[in-house]
């Protein structure tokens, strides 16, 4: 049995980026052969990544990159809040945003194929899954390239906003981005609100109005009033501006001779169903499995 020294472990770690204990185990299994140990680690890390790939990634971060009139916003997910504070995970998210801004990939597959530190982004992602032991995925991204200006705003790491705008004062764009993060509009104007959201709101309003027992013509007016109110509440231009409750966002833009052409907001995990762990059931299942063994 070969003697495994700290220097051998350090060299293998530098080569593979694997955890120290994993490196030591691999060297022991390979009887001190660094080439075999590297192969063992690649298999183990690959297996670790494959096992993690089926787990839900509802945590994560939003990262952004703005260079001149080009901006990128990306959501990168992981399984636990703990990993969102990991420096390597944060570096991967920021690298994603930079690659998107620089290369304009057509989709997630094209993004994953882009080069990063001598490998592809997808290879770097798989390696990080292997090292951390937790699934992570690039969920979505958007890229703005405009003749005007682009600004991004991150509220912590969980909410990200990017705005395409025209204004003499860049602070206007920053204020609008902060407003969007706070008020969470779903569209620029009432006309842009998705039809499915309007239909859902109308259905709820109809049920509430029907319970009032009022005449049909009154019920119809109540429904239309509710829908109209909803459209004002969820469209950016109609919302009351957070920095001045005496005017709407649209009025503020007119006063400053500014326009907002488009915006995107990402909220981490939005729409992802998180797995609810049942610890008691998990223990019971393990006990039952042990009895059958």
Swiss-Prot record:
GO molecular function ontology, one term from the record: translation elongation factor activity
Region (Involved in Mg(2+) ion dislocation from EF-Tu): 80-83
Lineage top rank: taxon: Bacteria
Disulfide bonds listed in the record: none
PROSITE patterns in UniProt: EF_TS_2
Gene3D superfamilies: 1.10.286.20, DNA helicase RuvA subunit, C-terminal domain, Elongation factor Ts, dimerisation domain
InterPro entries referenced in this protein's UniProt entry, alphabetically: EF-Ts_dimer_sf, Transl_elong_EFTs/EF1B, Transl_elong_EFTs/EF1B_dimer, Transl_elong_Ts_CS, UBA-like_sf
A Pfam family annotated for this UniProt entry: EF_TS
CDD domains, per the entry: UBA_EF-Ts
GO cellular component, one term: cytoplasm
Transmembrane regions listed in the UniProt entry: none
Keywords noted in UniProt: Cytoplasm, Elongation factor, Protein biosynthesis
Record localization: Cytoplasm
Protein purpose: Associates with the EF-Tu.GDP complex and induces the exchange of GDP to GTP. It remains bound to the aminoacyl-tRNA.EF-Tu.GTP complex up to the GTP hydrolysis stage on the ribosome.
Recorded family membership: Belongs to the EF-Ts family.
PANTHER family hit by this protein: ELONGATION FACTOR TS (PTHR11741), ELONGATION FACTOR TS, MITOCHONDRIAL (PTHR11741:SF0)
Name of the featured protein: Elongation factor Ts
Taxonomic path: Bacteria, Pseudomonadati, Pseudomonadota, Betaproteobacteria, Burkholderiales
UniProt gene name: tsf
